[in-house]
Amino acid sequence: MDTAPTWFTGQLLLALPGIGDPRFEHSVIAMISHDEDGAMGIGIADPIEGMTVGAVLDQLGIEHEAPLDQPVYLGGPVEPSRGFVLHSRDWGGEGAVLVADRWMVSSSHDILRAIGEGRGPSRWLVALGYAGWSPGQLEGEMVRHGWHVTPGSDALLFDTPPARRWQAAFAEAGVDARLLTTKGGEA
């Protein structure tokens, strides 16, 4: 029997303990795209120490009224100087892409100007870099128990403090993350 592949666009990937790559320990990744050509996601649980949205806007010469002290997240190891804004669907400016009818992602300065001027989306987060997988790579990592997939909620994505996102995402999926282990028991 031939079964259709399962794609994870619009869902959250949660790193399982012992994933084998320290860059992804306790990662929560919002999946932007996943299909036969590979996958792309943005990490939403690892703030870059000392970097705020206001500081990024200052570096880009974009004026802003509010201090914008929200953290900038490490989106992943691929293209770490490339910025992304993951945001609610109530803003659809230049280059905004709808992700699985759930949220949107933008990477233009247009959205940063809108945020700086207070006319951007109602909910958003900014990340640098992304996580990328070649065709079949993510599926292989799933077989090796590297990731858990969950729908996640908008509240988890935008409202939960970053230090709690990994554990909270597992809790939303009905899993107590404290009980996860990399070691098997003996019967």
From Swiss-Prot:
Name of the protein: UPF0301 protein Sala_0165
SUPFAM superfamilies: VC0467-like
Organism of origin: Sphingopyxis alaskensis (strain DSM 13593 / LMG 18877 / RB2256)
GO terms for cellular component: cytosol
Family of the protein in this entry: Belongs to the UPF0301 (AlgH) family.
Pfam families: DUF179
HAMAP family per record: UPF0301
